[in-house]
Structures are given as structure tokens and as C-alpha cells.
Amino acid sequence: MNKLIRRAVTIFAVTSVASLFASGVLETSMAESLSTNVISLADTKAKDNTSHKSKKARKNHSKETPVDRKEVAPVHESKATGPKQDSCFGRMYTVKVNDDRNVEITQAVPEYATVGSPYPIEITATGKRDCVDVIITQQLPCEAEFVRSDPATTPTADGKLVWKIDRLGQGEKSKITVWVKPLKEGCCFTAATVCACPEIRSVTKCGQPAICVKQEGPENACLRCPVVYKINIVNQGTATARNVVVENPVPDGYAHSSGQRVLTFTLGDMQPGEHRTITVEFCPLKRGRATNIATVSYCGGHKNTASVTTVINEPCVQVSIAGADWSYVCKPVEYVISVSNPGDLVLRDVVVEDTLSPGVTVLEAAGAQISCNKVVWTVKELNPGESLQYKVLVRAQTPGQFTNNVVVKSCSDCGTCTSCAEATTYWKGVAATHMCVVDTCDPVCVGENTVYRICVTNRGSAEDTNVSLMLKFSKELQPVSFSGPTKGTITGNTVVFDSLPRLGSKETVEFSVTLKAVSAGDARGEAILSSDTLTVPVSDTENTHIY
């Protein structure tokens, strides 16, 4: 066991010296000296053992055959392992450098060789991961002559052999064998290095989107009756279609509820096999042929179109609504709804639906069903040429522009017939500006101060504009200072505030004037308020007792 440990330590020491030599830290002479000292020291330790163990070791050593020897002997010990009959070098031993990240490299050399006879150096590189541009460099022994190599290469001027492997996959091995011939006795140091670039591979799946569009619609329709088209879009390709957009111009003679002339639908991305359906509804305004064209486009692809032609027939039902263009808030307004059948067919199950805007209250609608802001009349039949008229009385609680929408739906041999109409009324509010004047201290002593506070409030439902305030005081009171939402000016016993541009509904502002009592008496303060709503200025008087 001691013998095995000794030889393992010796091999490790010699290998370390070889590594230092390959890295350039040691010169040739120094490396040879260190190697010789290591081997001599190992022999000296062996001789210090007991004579019995020494004799037994020598006896075992003389009887040991080269083939059965398992431990690695020092490089200079030619008797450690005998060569084969046709070779002049010993058994190969391996030195491994493990680079867990990229490439693992091992180098195998004989335990000993004979001067003048070639011996091999075997280098094996194993890929730890996929690498490219793998470069293996072999430093030739200094006192040896290059014979050949497999793969073949030519030594450089500084005695190096270089091989390049374009790609070495994970788990793949590449073996190199170099034959050199030692020129003199001693230790032949050799070293191999490897340099590799890790390779990262990525895959991009390429496909081709193919957007197809089809459209469905009626062959015939009635004037002023809804015409519905279904646009079907499907991606029949193998890749995602990006930024899919469908454009549908409103055909000539049609109207859309949005008021737009081109309808645009942004579908975003569509996966392969994905299907989308868009429904568009138009109201025909004139008879004749109308063609609806839908065009689909997507990023990097060609535009595709689909069209349907519809023949618009005579109208079946008509509706109109009339009412005031404007009115004051809380004042009732009457709308008149007229429904007629100008066609040749009997209309059945006629439904007249009047929908009012939020904020509008229905006061009266004879013969109708009222539900919140919706009024509905029903008629079993409406003969050709017949007309009906309905009235609805409403009132708005707040100012604003409100639209009254009427839709008539009916059935006929021409199919479902619908007509719609609307009327818009602007409901105006009324401003109601009021003023209140109080003094904070009453009575006051001569030389003391009192404050007049003037509160101006708009109690109405509309804003008031250009609100102006002026205050006049008797000789017993002298204005000292003022405050308010606008600037003011003191002239003698009069204070004038600049006009307030607007006073909103239910809004209150406050003005104040600080006055000094200069003489005893029953003083008076008059506030005069004017605005665009107040055609005649409003005045309010407050008295203050001074003693």
C-alpha cells in the first residue's frame, strides 16, 4: 500500500511540474531539475524502510511483469512497465483537465520512452456542451523531434502544433495522436491546451398567415328597413396574422347609426385557424342596387375583399317625429310621432317604440305602455296608405341637449320592416341670482369697525354672467378694506367690485367690506347687484346704529 501511495504522489508531482512548464512558469532546465529531485526523493524514502520490506519490494519488483502493473511509474523509470515486442516505450498513462463549462481535454503519454525511438502523445477532447471554433494547441517536448500527427499538422516556429475543430457537440469526442522522437535522456515535458466558444442555438418557426374573408347578406331588402351583413374572417395560414383590420365603407344609398361613412374594425392578432364574425347593419335610404364591400388587411399581407349586392325595394313603413327645438327646464314639451304605410303590403304586428334620453320624464302618452324613459305603442295591422299619429308629453329636469329616438318595427311579406326617426330638443336653464346683505357688528361705537357681508347666490338652473356689485355707504361709515372673488375700488364712501364673468347654477360667492364708524347716527349701506340675467339691477339696504 505504501508503494502505491508513493508512486501516486510521484506521478502527481511530475504532472504538476509538467503543467507549470506548459504554462511558461518554469524553464526547461528548472523543470528537469525539479522532476529529478522529486523522483530521487521518492527513491530515498523507499530505501529508508526496513530491510525486510526493502528486499521484499525489490523481489516483487523484479518479478512484476510490465503488463500486470497497474500503478503509474515516474517518467524516467524505464523498468516500470516494459514495452511490447514491437515498441520502445512504456504503458500509457493519462492526465485529465476537466472544464465543466465547455470542453474536457485529456492527454495520454508513455511512462517512459527510448532515445531515438518515436512514442505517441494522445489528446482527447470531449464536448461538455455544444461548442464551435475549438482550438487545441500541443506544446512539443524541447528535446524531441516531431515525426507525424493524426490529423496532420505542421509545427510552428515555437514548437507548437495547432488543430482547429469547427464544431464539437455535447458528448462528442475528438482524438489527436502525435508521434515524437526523443533526442536525449531526461524528462520530455509536453502540454496541451484547448480554447472553445460555447454555441447557443435557437429556432424560429416561420409560417405564412392567410386571411380569407367572406360576406353574407340578403338579395332583397325594403327601403328604410335594416339590412344586415355578416363578414366572416378566418386565418387559414400557418402563422399568426398581426394587426388584422376590416374596413367596410358605407354603400351609396345606405346610412349607418354611427353617422360614419367608413366603418373600421380592429381585430388585432388572429392565430392560425381562428375565426371572427362581424355584423354590420345599414338603413337603405333609396331604392336600387347597393353593394357592400368589406376589405381585410393585416401586417405584411395582401388585402382581401368580399362583396354582396342587395336590391332595395319600395318602402314598407315610415315614421317621423316633431317637437320643439328648445324649451326651458321643467316646462312640458309635446312630441308628435307619425307612422305611415306608403307601400303596397299590409304591415302586421307594428311596434312603435319611443326612447327618451336620461333626465327626461314622461308626463303623458295616451294608449302607450310607459316604462321609465321608454314609451311603446302596438298596432295589429297597418294597411297600405294608412297613417297613425301618437303624442307624448315630456319634461326635462336639467339643462342640456336631449334626443328623442323613435323606432318602428313591423312584419310583412317583404320581411321585417323597420324605420327610425329622432328629434333633438335643447333644454335651457334659467338663472335666478339673489343677494343678501348683513352687518357683523350692530350697534358700534365711534372709532370701531364693522363688516358688511354680501352673499350672492344663483338659485336657478343656468349660469349667470357678468355679475357686478356696488356698495354705497352713508357719511357715518368710512370704507377701510374689502375682499371678494373679484378686485374692488374704494372711492369716497363707495366700493365697486369688478364684474364676475360667470356664476354657476347653485353657486354662491361672498363679498365683504370693512367699515369704520366715524360719527354717531343711523348709518345706511346699500348694495346694488346687476348681471346679464337681471335686466333691472337689484338693491338691498342694511342699517347700522353708531353711538
Curated annotation (Swiss-Prot):
Coiled-coil stretches noted in the UniProt entry, renumbered to this chain: none
Annotated Basic and acidic residues bias: 62-79
Residue ranges with Basic residues bias: 52-61
GO CC aspect terms: periplasmic space
GO molecular function: extracellular matrix structural constituent
Record keywords: Cell shape, Disulfide bond, Periplasm, Signal
Signal sequence, start to end: 1-22
Proregion positions: 23-40
Result when mutating I233V: In strain: B/TW-05/OT
A biological-process GO annotation: regulation of cell shape
Pfam families given in the database record: Chlam_OMP6, DUF11
Primary site of residence: periplasm
Subcellular location: Periplasm
InterPro entries: Chlam_OMP6, Chlamydia_OmcB, DUF11_rpt, Ig-like_fold, OmcB-like_DUF11
Stated role: In elementary bodies (EBs, the infectious stage, which is able to survive outside the host cell) provides the structural integrity of the outer envelope through disulfide cross-links with the small cysteine-rich protein and the major outer membrane protein. It has been described in publications as the Sarkosyl-insoluble COMC (Chlamydia outer membrane complex), and serves as the functional equivalent of peptidoglycan.
Assembly: Part of a disulfide cross-linked outer membrane complex (COMC) composed of the major outer membrane porin (MOMP), the small cysteine-rich protein (OmcA) and the large cysteine-rich periplasmic protein (OmcB).
Protein name: Large cysteine-rich periplasmic protein OmcB
Source species of the chain: Chlamydia trachomatis serovar D (strain ATCC VR-885 / DSM 19411 / UW-3/Cx)
Name of the coding gene: omcB
